[in-house]
Amino acid sequence: MVGIVGYGAYVPSYRIKVEEIAKVWGDDPVALSRGLVVNEKSVPSADEDTATIAVTAARYALARAQIDPQKIGAIYVGSESHPYAVKPSATIVAEAINATPDLTAADLEFACKAGTAGIQMTMGLVDSDMIEYGLAIGADTSQGAPGDALEYTASAGGAAYIIGKDNTLADIEETYSFTTDTPDFYRREGQDYPSHGGRFTGEPAYFKHVLSAAKGLFEKTDSKPEDYDYACFHQPNGKFYLRAGKKLGFTSEQIKQGLLTPNIGNTYSGAVPLALSNILDVAEPGDKIFVVSYGSGAGSDGFTLTVNEEIKEKRDLAPKTQDIIDRKQYVDYAVYAKFKGKIKM
């Protein structure tokens, strides 16, 4: 069965608190933190971008997989903040991990679910025996306009997954997707910051797609919430994540391990891959995991996984997600604005 052979995560070490951003714009930090369920977010340094995040996560995934990178037949990097408009991030990753030249590679974009789309694509290639291993990465250095609500959550980070058939640490048993044309969030070529539909991004966008994908996956697998040990969903903020879990019938115990947004913000394409990596860091053999991503535009990908014995041998071969998150240094708004290129000369 196709499954995860190795995984790796990376989150930049810099952080900015919600109260620091609120101080600049005269907003109420207590109300914002309570409403969004976000306390602080990650900030990429001046020398960090989607490609560097993807490379680091990929190297950690290789460390856990313990395979020859030359056996990787496909690399897909999902992001909405690729450093180049014309120049793939995937080839940078491929060269950095010594996987070139005998492979296919491409950059993917579907708002915040491009990473899980890459997982589905590698699953198909591996399952059909077209390749032995595939590498799928979800990573972003997301942007929010100064003073916009997104500025309190848009952050940076990502995770990588090596997909294969042998020595899997978790089997991916089923996948299901739900997709419509819903323009809740978008950015045209040349624009520095995205536009969004405000409250419209909730019920007809995020919740409609996440809940529909989850229900479709329940039906496809003939399963229910209590059949799973862990569950995680896309998390533009903590509030949406917790509400989605409750609506679907999951308990707080099932979903708490995957909730990372309060301490790192919304890593966009990295959100669900990072949540899953944090679950794999603690899951035991036999545990079942339920995962649903979301990308504006709009669509959701769902997965069910079962953890295998190999997790015990592999998870300590690379830094754990929470350890990476705990390594942090706070910056003020001036440094944050400089790192994020918000100051235009």
From Swiss-Prot:
One of its GO terms (biological process) is isopentenyl diphosphate biosynthetic process, mevalonate pathway. Its EC number is 2.3.3.10. Pathway: Metabolic intermediate biosynthesis; (R)-mevalonate biosynthesis; (R)-mevalonate from acetyl-CoA: step 2/3. The active site is at E80, C112, H234. It catalyses: acetoacetyl-CoA + acetyl-CoA + H2O = (3S)-3-hydroxy-3-methylglutaryl-CoA + CoA + H(+). This is Hydroxymethylglutaryl-CoA synthase. Keywords: Acyltransferase, Isoprene biosynthesis, Transferase. CoA binds at R199, K239. Catalyzes the condensation of acetyl-CoA with acetoacetyl-CoA to form 3-hydroxy-3-methylglutaryl-CoA (HMG-CoA). Functions in the mevalonate (MVA) pathway leading to isopentenyl diphosphate (IPP), a key precursor for the biosynthesis of isoprenoid compounds that are building blocks of archaeal membrane lipids. The lineage of its organism: Archaea, Methanobacteriati, Methanobacteriota, Methanomada group, Methanobacteria. It comes from the Archaea. (3S)-3-hydroxy-3-methylglutaryl-CoA binds at D28, C112, T153, T201, H234, R243, N266, S296. SUPFAM superfamilies: Thiolase-like. Interacts with acetoacetyl-CoA thiolase that catalyzes the precedent step in the pathway and with a DUF35 protein. The acetoacetyl-CoA thiolase/HMG-CoA synthase complex channels the intermediate via a fused CoA-binding site, which allows for efficient coupling of the endergonic thiolase reaction with the exergonic HMGCS reaction. It is an enzyme of class 2 (transferase).
